[in-house]
Amino acid sequence: MNNPKKKTATGSSQKKVSKKGPSFDDVKKIPGQLKTRAQVLVLMLEVQKGASLQHSLDRAFQDFSPQERGFALELLMGSLRDYIPLQMEVRKCLAKPLKSSGKWLEALLVLGAYQLTSMNTPARAVIHSMVEIVRTLGYDHLVGLANGVLRGVQRNIEAANRKLKPLAIHDYLNEGHWLHAELFKNWRKCRIS
């Protein structure tokens, strides 16, 4: 019979989380900032299953410091808000779709993609923390997949940023060419830049 305990890189044995994904009990043993990210993953999974966001937040925030609450709320709300585009970005970096039992991993990768795209967190820190969560939860065989997908997302973001051209003044002031021309004609010395 298969033993549910698995040896980690540090030599300690730990139980794999269920196929449905981690629970609050699974992430309690995770140390420091990784614990915050892992709890946000559990919150996201609960909300996706139909749980009340407010009830889940109240339960999770009992363990958070005020600083962790702000980070967790930004990460959770931003990831949920941008879930579909982030999910598409993650899926572009996968060779084949994840199985239905891997939805928790996809949610974790979406959290990582949100941090890479929208938060001011260094890419190496984001990738390392997401990979460490996978490893700590006992899924050593998925570490390479998580690392590769997040590095792919990082490369796609960098490529998209290189393609961006500087905006003309009428683009970021949300005014037409004609208005900009009139303003420039009448107030030539007052330049907006």
Language-model features, listed with the residues they occupy:
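Class I Rossmann-like S-adenosyl-L-methionine
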Residues: 1-193
